[in-house]
From Swiss-Prot:
GO terms for biological process: vasodilation. It comes from the Eukaryota. Its main location: secreted. Heme-based protein that deliver nitric oxide gas (NO) to the victim while feeding, resulting in vasodilation and inhibition of platelet aggregation. Reversibly binds nitric oxide (NO). Also binds tightly to histamine, which is released by the host to induce wound healing. Disulfide bonds join C25-C145, C64-C194. The lineage of its organism: Eukaryota, Metazoa, Ecdysozoa, Arthropoda, Hexapoda. Residues 1-23 form the signal peptide. Heme binds at H82. Gene3D superfamilies: 2.40.128.20. Salivary gland (at protein level). This is Nitrophorin-1.
């Protein structure tokens, strides 16, 4: 059985290689100029529609992921969900976010049940960082890096959309190109028969 950290890597959109295989994360993921935090963190759900993992040795071929980002009790929060269409396993995590600079965040996470009961609490040295490289009302491009024991586990880029059935548009594709990436290298999650639990996901922002 994979360790919790390996499963968490999937649950937080970081489909990195197996735990223990480290790859330094890029320092060149730049946040969007003029990033509108209120629109991104409005409490609604973002779906992962396409992803690029630069440490792909242990990446599942099919997965579904979504996140809700919002503000609760004056704190920036993120609730994350993963669904494996093959095994039908689900994972939930809740994070409090620290803003390092506009569009750049560090998240200390805990593994929870769908009702918010804690399964694994925040662990020192285990966290993830993410950068919102582009965002508009309906789409976004983010870069994520999972850190275990203060070691990087590699880069993941994800294209998000507010609509789970929408193809990536020209603007977010342009952001991919501007980041010196090729959209053709991204893997789509659209045909994975994804199932989502948006009610639980949104409610976890208050946990």
């Amino acid at each position: 059985m994979k360790s919790y950290t390996a499963l968490l890597a999937v649950a937080i959109l970081c489909l990195f290689a197996a735990v223990g295989v480290s790859g330094k994360c890029t320092k060149n993921a730049l946040a969007q100029t003029g990033f509108n935090k209120d629109k991104y963190f409005n409490g609604d759900v973002w779906y992962v529609t396409d992803y690029l993992d630069l440490e792909p040795d242990d990446v599942p071929k099919r997965y579904c992921a979504a996140l809700a980002a919002g503000t609760a009790s004056g704190k920036l929060k993120e609730a994350l969900y993963h669904y494996d269409p093959k095994t039908q396993d689900t994972f939930y995590d809740v994070s409090e976010l620290q803003e390092e600079s506009p569009g750049k965040y560090t998240a200390n996470f805990k593994k929870v049940e769908k009702n918010g009961n804690v399964k694994v609490d925040v662990t020192s040295g285990n966290y993830y960082t993410f950068t919102v490289m582009y965002a508009d009302d309906s789409s976004a491009l983010i870069h994520t890096c999972l850190h275990k024991g203060n070691k990087d586990l590699g880069d993941l880029y994800a294209v998000l959309n507010r609509n789970k059935d929408t193809n990536a548009g020209d603007k977010v594709k342009g952001a991919v190109t501007a980041a010196s990436l090729k959209f053709s290298d991204f893997i789509s999650t659209k045909d994975n028969k994804c199932e989502y639990d948006n009610v639980s996901l949104k409610s976890l922002l208050t946990k």
